[in-house]
Design a protein with these regions (language model features):
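ATP/adenylate-binding site constellation spanning eukaryotic-like Ser/Thr protein kinases
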Residues: 19, 59, 78
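Short Asp/Glu-rich motifs
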Residues: 51-52, 73
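Short amphipathic alpha-helix with an adjacent loop that forms part of the alpha/beta core around
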Residues: 52-57, 83-85
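Thiol-based oxidoreductase modules, predominantly thioredoxin-like and allied folds used
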Residues: 37-50, 61
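Structural micro-motif
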Residues: 57-65
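Non-catalytic, surface beta->alpha helical segment in thiol-disulfide oxidoreductase systems
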Residues: 67-88
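Local sequence-structure signature of Cys/Sec-based thiol-disulfide redox active-site neighborhoods
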Residues: 2-37
């Protein structure tokens, strides 16, 4: 799991940053939906400020999954996401 991104506010709910054209973003959302994990979706194609914030932190790949507490994963596999959720 990656460290905390200083410029990203600590979310109260798991937050997924991605785009509608991203296959990994769809897979991540399907996984979260399938496990009934509540999350907030931020479409970077519609939210320029969020996209700029991620880019300013060197995060150019999606999805970026930010967990409560501020830790984040970039392009996590389903097993990586499951482990992060179990640890949070």
């Amino acid at each position: 799991m990656s460290s905390i991104i200083p410029a990203i506010p600590d979310p109260e709910i798991l937050t997924v940053y991605g785009t509608t054209r991203c296959g990994d973003c769809h897979r991540t959302r399907r996984y979260l939906d399938g496990t009934q994990t509540p999350y907030r979706w931020v479409d970077l194609g519609q939210d320029d400020a969020a996209r700029d914030m991620l880019h300013a932190n060197g995060l150019l790949a999606v999805p970026v999954v930010v967990l409560p507490g501020g830790r984040y994963l970039v392009e996590p596999s389903d097993p990586e996401l499951a482990a992060a959720l179990a640890a949070s």
